């Protein structure tokens, strides 16, 4: 990758990442206000939404030909990378354990991982259906 393409990719990732992080904040804030702080609904929601959209986008960018690289940087690496958050998932699990609510950790991890996997496959199926020539 030459220097110009590298810088273009970096700018696309930063732009998408800023938007994705802002979107994560908005979704998390709305769900916190609606459901309270008893369960990390915001992190769960953004990770499941991100899984679905990533599956869809993976198929969609493959259909873009040579422009697919730029779209991948902007939308998958940037936007979805900024929207979803593995570190928050782990921190929330630690908080549950430290607050003597460790039984919820297994439930939270199972839901996140199982539904995340399901959603990425569903998004890819939708992407294949929508992008089918």
Swiss-Prot record:
Membrane protein topology class: Multi-pass membrane protein
Compartments (UniProt record): Cell inner membrane
Molecular functions (GO terms): fluoride channel activity; metal ion binding
Cellular component annotations (GO), alphabetically ordered: plasma membrane
Activity regulation summary: Na(+) is not transported, but it plays an essential structural role and its presence is essential for fluoride channel function.
Entry keyword annotation includes Cell inner membrane: yes
Extent of the signal sequence: none
Keyword tRNA-binding carried by entry: no
Binding site for Na(+): 81, 84
Broad class of the protein's primary localization: membrane
InterPro entries named among the record's database cross-references: FluC
Keyword annotations from UniProtKB, A to Z: Cell inner membrane, Cell membrane, Ion channel, Ion transport, Membrane, Metal-binding, Sodium, Transmembrane, Transmembrane helix, Transport
Pfam families hit by this protein: CRCB
Catalytic activity: fluoride(in) = fluoride(out)
Positions of transmembrane segments: 3-23, 41-61, 76-96, 103-123
A GO BP entry: cellular detoxification of fluoride
Record HAMAP family: FluC
Function: Fluoride-specific ion channel. Important for reducing fluoride concentration in the cell, thus reducing its toxicity.
Family to which the UniProt record says this protein belongs: Belongs to the fluoride channel Fluc/FEX (TC 1.A.43) family.
Alphabetical list of PANTHER family matching this protein: FLUORIDE EXPORT PROTEIN 1-RELATED (PTHR28259), FLUORIDE-SPECIFIC ION CHANNEL FLUC (PTHR28259:SF18)
Protein name, per record: Fluoride-specific ion channel FluC
Species for this entry: Xylella fastidiosa (strain Temecula1 / ATCC 700964)
Gene this protein is translated from: fluC
